[in-house]
């Protein structure tokens, strides 16, 4: 079927999203004399209940993951069917902008409050995607601009939440005098995989249900434009709310 023909490209994008954090320089966390807690679920539940920063960060990161997952999974379909060109060059521009923007975003995170910088780029990503729904065949330069700006915002989504999380880990371990880093990173990894799985499992069947299913000769483009151009904006709105509620450590 048509969707299976692009599975290799989708796997490539998914792999890049999951492997990118490996390329980001790890932030050192102090290692005081801490006690290891035996109960994983109890520790995580207790952290969610007592640390509002951790809860807000996880919720914001989940919605950001869903938004980025949908745009990444539908990227090739959108470029081929709406813009009408090969997606390779736009993929290079998109991910290239993300990587090139990392040093700039890292510097901004050091100079200003990381939470405020992240919220700014979440809002910028929403503004950048507003024209996407209205793009049509041949709008290559307009979509190239979207790729550059949204790729830059993707860099912020990759580096700033991880940096904020490192601060939360350090603060929580000092407050509770127990080892929490492994548990928190496990939750973080689960959120990454869950958001990507939900994006793939929901958006592709949804656009097929509403009329875009090339394997059955259905080429209604409105569902594809809505899913790629509008849904990521909607999903980022709760992320703005939760990220705005993060308090500076």
Spans of features found by a protein language model:
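Membrane-embedded alpha-helical bundles of multi-pass transporters/translocases
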Residues: 1-249
């Amino acid at each position: 079927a048509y969707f299976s023909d692009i599975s290799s490209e989708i796997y490539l994008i998914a792999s890049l999203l999951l492997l990118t954090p490996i390329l980001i320089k790890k932030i050192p966390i102090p290692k005081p004399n801490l006690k290891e807690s035996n109960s994983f679920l109890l520790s995580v539940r207790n952290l969610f209940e007592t640390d509002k920063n951790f809860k807000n960060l996880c919720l914001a990161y989940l919605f950001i993951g869903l938004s980025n997952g949908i745009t990444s999974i539908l990227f090739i379909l959108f470029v081929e069917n709406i813009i009408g060109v090969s997606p390779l060059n736009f993929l290079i521009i998109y991910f290239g902008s993300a990587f090139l923007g990392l040093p700039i975003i890292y510097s901004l995170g050091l100079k200003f409050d990381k939470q405020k910088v992240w919220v700014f780029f979440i809002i910028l990503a929403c503004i950048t995607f507003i024209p996407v729904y209205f793009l049509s065949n041949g709008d290559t330069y307009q979509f190239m601009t979207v790729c550059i700006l949204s790729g830059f915002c993707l860099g912020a989504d990759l580096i700033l939440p991880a940096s904020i999380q490192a601060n939360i880990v350090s603060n929580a371990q000092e407050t509770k005098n127990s080892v929490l880093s492994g548990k928190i990173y496990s939750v973080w990894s689960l959120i990454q995989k869950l958001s990507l799985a939900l994006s793939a499992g929901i958006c592709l069947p949804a656009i097929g249900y509403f009329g875009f299913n090339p394997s059955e000769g259905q080429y209604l483009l409105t569902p594809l434009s809505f899913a790629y151009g509008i849904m990521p904006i909607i999903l980022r709105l709760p992320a703005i709310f939760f990220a705005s509620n993060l308090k500076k450590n």
